[in-house]
Amino acid sequence: VDISFFPEDPFALDKLAKENNVTAIMDCGVAPGMGNIIFSYHDQSMQISDYECLVGGLPKNREWPFEYKAVFSPIDVIEEYTRPARFVHNSQLVVKEALSETELIDFDGVGTLESWNSDGLRTLIDTMNHVPNMIEKTLRYPGCVEYLKVLRACGYFSKEEVNVNGKKIKPIDLTSKLL
């Protein structure tokens, strides 16, 4: 069972797993993962035309400046802020910039949260291609997106090495360590 994101196509492992009599379960965290399982369960008993997964790891106690605690690899969290978001609209694959189409959503007992398009559908794009509208949105406390856009624009999420006092570092490595 794999719960981490990796950029390669997870279906590429299918043949290798079958050849070695191995059951491989990829992308089995909260989302993708548990959300996919719940979606599939309901898909077996009803016709689904719209699937919207709202997901976010929010700390119980909000602490400035991020009001967020990474519950998995910090680099993978940062990837959510830089990797283009893929979703399905009217049976067509749509790709948007990370952190796009921000909206505020009110939740009883929680309050207002900020959401944006994220790239968590992963295998659902292929395995549930009969569902014409599917999207995943990440949730954070309000104000997070603008803060992240500033960090991204300043290069803190860059994978390109920079020279700092004679040492080459990738800004994303430093940022993930500090977060």
Model-inferred region functions:
Residues 2-4, 27-31, 113:
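Glycine- and other small-residue-rich loops at beta-strand/loop junctions that grip anionic moieties
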Residues 3-26:
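Rossmann-fold NAD(P)-binding glycine/threonine-rich loop
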Residues 7, 30-34, 59:
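Gly/Ser/Thr-rich loops at beta-strand to alpha-helix junctions
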Residues 13-14, 39, 43, 125:
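Short amphipathic alpha-helical segments and helix-helix/interface helices
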Residues 23-32, 92:
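Conserved, well-structured beta-alpha core segment at the onset of a catalytic domain
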Residues 28-38, 43:
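Short alpha-helices
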Residues 45-179:
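C-terminal catalytic/substrate-binding lobe primarily of soluble NAD(P)-dependent oxidoreductases
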